[in-house]
């Protein structure tokens, strides 16, 4: 997709919910893996993660976030014209999780509700999708719920989270600028190869097998990630994409208050920051405490690190998500007068 601009769309607010359960990468592992985990934490920067209870779905976290946001905004339920759910952890393969949440949230039947399957890069795509509905004139107020449930005790990277963001029509609102991209030739770099129609789940896919001599165990139904390919993709694609969007918007790096990137790992994120020449204080991070929360990582970081600053005055924020697909999206948005309630634990 070419770069694009949305006008008359206001960023009204955001809420984020994470599980109460905290998993430590250093202590919640087998004793024989302790030394390896210590080295890993130094490289990826993830010390603790949030993991949902067995009964919790992504939709439960997103529901709590949406409830808190609607309360903070004092929006009436009947005013919500659109509900978009962006996740790779739906409640069911069918129906759409958005339909279920439309009912749980008490939204009217006139609310258009649908799901989008996207992970790490999800947030800029989600803002563009909802913003486009609003800019087209058919939607006045809408919610987009983004997040996933991908954490496990044995995986040191991923965390669970659900987020809600509200956009509304506002004549004369500062423009939102976007640049969204996809490269499906790299789809195998991050993939769940089993569970779809290409490879239905069989009994053999559920059996754990030893991956290497370090006592790592894996199942065919688990996420497969090519770390080298992801590192190369992220560090090569993201910096030029940021420069491209800034040039398109006629903005300089000095004019941007915060640069919020998908929280992949320390090595990737630090390489991107240094390539762009950005000061640490302009690049908030939640990797240490929350790990990689997939599509929710941008809202998690905004809520957990800079929500008070975002509420206090007008801020120009550049948001960049990248990963599964492969895909990457960048958004430049001015935020003023928006609601950012504190992080919810559920």
Predicted regions and their residues:
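A structural motif shared across PLP-dependent enzymes of the aminotransferase-like
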Residues: 28-35, 60, 89-100, 264-267
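Short beta-strand segments
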Residues: 12-15, 86, 117, 142-148, ...
């Amino acid at each position: 997709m070419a770069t694009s601009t949305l006008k008359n769309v206001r960023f009204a607010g955001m809420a984020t919910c994470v599980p109460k359960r905290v998993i430590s990468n250093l202590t919640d592992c087998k004793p024989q893996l302790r030394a390896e985990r210590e080295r890993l934490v130094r490289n990826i920067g993830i010390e603790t993660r949030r993991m949902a209870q067995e009964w919790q779905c992504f939709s439960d976290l997103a529901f709590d976030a949406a409830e808190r946001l609607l309360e903070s905004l004092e929006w009436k339920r009947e005013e919500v014209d659109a509900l978009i759910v962006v996740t790779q952890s739906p409640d069911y393969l069918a129906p759409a999780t958005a339909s279920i949440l439309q009912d749980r949230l008490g939204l009217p039947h006139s609310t258009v509700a649908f799901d989008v399957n996207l992970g790490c890069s999800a947030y800029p795509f989600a803002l563009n999708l909802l913003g486009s509905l609003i800019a087209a004139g058919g939607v006045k107020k809408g919610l987009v719920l983004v997040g996933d449930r991908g954490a496990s005790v044995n995986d040191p990277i991923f965390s669970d989270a659900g987020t809600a963001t509200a956009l509304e029509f506002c004549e004369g609102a500062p423009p939102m600028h976007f640049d969204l991209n996809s490269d499906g030739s790299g789809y195998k770099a991050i993939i769940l190869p089993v569970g779809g129609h290409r490879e239905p789940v069989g009994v053999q896919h559920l059996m754990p097998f030893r991956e290497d001599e370090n006592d790592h165990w894996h199942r065919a139904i688990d996420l497969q990630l090519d770390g080298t390919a992801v590192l190369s993709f992220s560090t090569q694609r993201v910096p030029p994409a940021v420069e491209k969007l800034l040039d398109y918007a006629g903005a300089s790096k000095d004019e941007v208050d915060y640069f919020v990137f998908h929280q992949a790992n320390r090595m990737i994120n630090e390489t991107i920051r240094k390539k762009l020449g950005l000061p640490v204080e302009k690049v908030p991070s939640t990797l240490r405490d929350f790990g990689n929360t997939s599509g929710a990582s941008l809202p998690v970081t905004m809520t957990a690190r800079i929500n008070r600053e975002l509420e206090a005055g007008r801020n120009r924020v550049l948001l960049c998500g990248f990963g599964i697909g492969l895909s990457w999206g960048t958004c430049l948005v001015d935020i003023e007068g928006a609601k950012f309630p504190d992080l919810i634990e559920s």
